[in-house]
Amino acid sequence: TENGTIGCHKTAGGHRKFTMQNVRDYYKVNKKASKSDEIALENFEHKKIYELIKKNNFSELAHKLANASIESDESTVKTIISGSYMNNIDVETLFDKIVDPGSMIVEKALHENYLSHTEAFISRKIITRASESLNDNKPNGSYNGKSALCVNFEDNLPDLGVVMSEVILRHKGYNVYNTGSHAELGDLKKVIDNKKIDLIVFYLCNMQCCMSVVGDNITKTADMVASIYETASKLKVEVIFGGLGIELLPDISKTIKKTFIT
């Protein structure tokens, strides 16, 4: 607002546009406001989730996230993710302690035949959509210093890992371009030049619904990584490889030095 209470963006027509980031920043400065039960209960679906968030009970939140996604309860999934974000849990902690563990609980249910492949995919898609909404608070723009390309492999169906990478990079000040699933990168040099890419992030999971790590596809995936890395190296673009799928590509770690598991 104009008196500086909560930051906002004013449009040419004079309208004020707020994002979750604006409100989040306000709560950072005004601790008493963030502790108000009235405000919390207005923004979060019920008191139990609010209490878990305030106590940083990440394990319980991860289980609630998994259960809500399995039940296709999108409202609760959004409440857990957006509520944690609004209470100033940084995105790295949110993903490492709540979202990724919640997704792995869904994967375990699939392994134990509690869920079908379709049900697990629906569940993870709900979590992915809620996570991706955090990008709205950090849009791409000329004010960002660097640009990153997040690469999901052609046969890799779940987008959650690459979406989490995108959210974190945006919060680090990057413009981020996400290829999504089944993307054909085509002339990578042209993409890097046109978008002025400084960093490429690969993400490969090893879940049952990920076809990039099945049979002959694992060789195809390894060849694709090697090809992209070679092109990026020639153009002096930094490369990071993430996800549990890296354990299935042992030669990659010898080539790409910067890696992460989750």
Segments predicted by a language model, with ranges:
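Long amphipathic alpha-helical segments
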Residues: 7-9, 13-139
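Polyanion-binding surface elements
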Residues: 1
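Glycine-centered, phosphate/nucleic-acid-interacting loop/turn motifs that mediate DNA/RNA or nucleotide
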Residues: 4
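C-terminal regulatory/effector modules of DNA-binding transcriptional regulators
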Residues: 113-116, 122, 126-262
